[in-house]
């Protein structure tokens, strides 16, 4: 048994300063005062927020694309995640040899026994045909509750294929998310840059302007609306993107959305850093302007967004990104961030924007659990829910650095950023796996059905 005493318990509708008792893997009692059972481990949480374990709905651990393989596999990635207070991740699984079922099986095998937090999978749809349509309900039966399509990259689907995909998914009730950038326009802008020889890093954001994001959001939302089915937009990065989501909702279209910490605290000036440092920040969508940052923060405070994902997709600076510094189109896109996601979002939203701890909790715990079929097993402090707990000391100020991070990448994009609030303790299904900021038990993660 574990009893957490006199913490500020972040419940779904209020803050309760009190105690929480975990027996085996479940929460069994929540009250202002709970007698300490014989033999129970006592955790003093005075001055700390006690959150339901954070859920990261957007990770790319152990991924290989056309340019490189990620620095972080399930082992290192989930260790970094849980040290950042994340007790559950949803990783992206891709098909194998054209098969969704085989792809899911392969990704489950890669993760089994190597994860230090709980996990489940989104299934990527990179082509649409009769076999894929036939396998969609099978992978849903096997635990997949969400699919992702791409409107960019070489494996993007056409509008008709996206329509067919949503039509096939609709009977299952699974969520359909999308990477929303106009791939054809990106290809055209990149081709123009290549003709002119403008391939330095500063051109990356110029080939993926915000209007390309908003156009794709409109198109994807329209396809969903044509089928009267809800859709989800991942990693919204711009004011234009937010505005388009609001326009779609005003039309009665069912659209949920996610943003990421990098778009709240980093901006496009990073692409002009000396000594090719800008390659560290190549990601898609790219970093935007301060104006976009402010719009995203306002949207978060005003309830436009449902979730905050890390989009952790790590590559090393020296060995993987830097070698393509003279051609931004060859730089592997993505950054580490699973460990820093929760505390950056906390500092920005709760400390800087005066968001309530309850509303913050919904973004990082409750809403992703509901969207992805894990609630109330995950995402809430309630009797009967899993004993997944993240304790944040509100008062500790610290500076984020690679030296204290646990990604296998050789940098973090948040180097030097000062935050107030630190993940102190983490409990995963009743196991006290992070104590005073140190990982004490590994590989206890289970696949979430």
Regions found by a protein language model. Give the residues of each.
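Histidine-rich, glycine-flanked metal-binding segment
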Residues: 1-3, 8-52
């Amino acid at each position: 048994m574990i009893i957490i005493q006199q913490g500020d318990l972040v419940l779904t509708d209020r803050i309760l300063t009190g105690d929480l008792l975990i027996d085996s893997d479940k929460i069994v009692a929540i009250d202002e005062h709970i007698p300490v059972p014989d033999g129970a481990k006592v955790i003093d949480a005075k001055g700390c927020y006690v959150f339901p374990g954070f859920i990261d709905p957007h990770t790319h651990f152990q991924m290989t694309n056309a340019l490189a393989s990620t620095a972080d596999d399930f082992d290192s990635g989930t260790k970094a995640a849980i040290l950042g207070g994340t007790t559950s991740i949803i990783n992206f699984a891709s098909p194998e040899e054209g098969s969704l079922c085989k792809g899911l099986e392969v990704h489950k095998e890669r993760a089994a026994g190597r994860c230090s937090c709980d996990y489940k999978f989104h299934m990527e749809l990179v082509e649409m045909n009769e076999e894929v349509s036939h396998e969609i309900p099978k992978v849903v039966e096997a635990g997949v509750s969400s699919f992702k399509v791409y409107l960019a990259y070489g494996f993007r689907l056409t509008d008709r294929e996206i329509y067919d995909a949503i039509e096939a998914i609709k009977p299952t009730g699974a969520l359909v998310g999308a990477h929303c950038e106009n791939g054809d326009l990106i290809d055209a802008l990149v081709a123009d840059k290549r003709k002119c020889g403008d391939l330095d890093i500063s051109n990356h954001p110029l080939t993926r302007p915000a209007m390309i994001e908003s156009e794709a959001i409109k198109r994807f939302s329209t396809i969903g609306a044509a089928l009267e089915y809800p859709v989800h937009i991942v990693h919204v990065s711009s004011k234009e993107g937010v505005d388009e989501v609001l326009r779609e909702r005003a039309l009665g279209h069912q659209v949920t959305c996610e943003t990421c910490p990098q778009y709240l605290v980093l901006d496009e000036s990073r692409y002009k850093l000396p000594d090719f440092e800008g390659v560290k920040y190549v990601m898609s969508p790219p970093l935007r302007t301060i104006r976009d940052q402010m719009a995203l923060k306002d949207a978060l405070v005003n309830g436009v967004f449902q979730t905050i994902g890390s989009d952790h997709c790590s590559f090393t600076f020296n060995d993987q990104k830097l070698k393509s510094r003279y051609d931004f189109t060859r730089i592997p896109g993505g950054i580490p961030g699973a460990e820093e996601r929760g505390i950056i979002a906390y500092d920005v939203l709760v400390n800087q924007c005066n968001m309530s701890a309850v509303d913050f909790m919904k973004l990082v715990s409750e809403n992703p659990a509901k969207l992805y079929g894990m609630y109330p097993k995950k995402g809430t402090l309630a009797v009967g829910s899993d004993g997944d707990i993240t304790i944040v000391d509100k008062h500790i100020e610290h500076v984020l650095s690679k030296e204290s991070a646990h990604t296998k990448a050789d940098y973090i994009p948040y180097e030097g950023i000062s935050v107030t609030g630190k993940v102190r303790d983490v409990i995963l299904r009743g196991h006290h796996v992070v104590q005073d900021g140190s990982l004490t038990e590994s590989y206890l993660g289970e696949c979430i059905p």
